[in-house]
């Protein structure tokens, strides 16, 4: 049986496994950690989670380029978009925590992945880009938008840190 695995692995990956990064591999293994005993390991999945890590990195770069300590607000925003993202974040973190408590790491990673990629990056950050270009925006309103972006990113980093510690730590330190 072992020879069969070695032979098949050598045939499928003659030059070893492509380097996708430790965090992408960790995220993949967490996403595969279901109640089933069989794991269908696919390098396309690792590549997809590498893309997720890149998406998180690029989102953090955008936010860091927009922010300084001086332009962050101590007052939370009352805008519909900022309230919406906090509600969505609370739902995602609550659901993810519940899945982790039940040892369903596959479902926990799915919830976080979908929130970060589809809600935070694809919708909220894009909303904020448009809002921040508004010439009539007051300094306080701009500060509240940036604070909401940062606060949500920080919450995401804390939630993801046990799964992908290297990229989250690097982003956090910056």
Where are these regions (language model features)?
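Intrinsically disordered, low-complexity acidic Ser/Thr-rich regulatory segments
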Residues: 1-25
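Helix-rich, typically C-terminal accessory recognition domains appended to large enzymatic cores
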Residues: 16-174
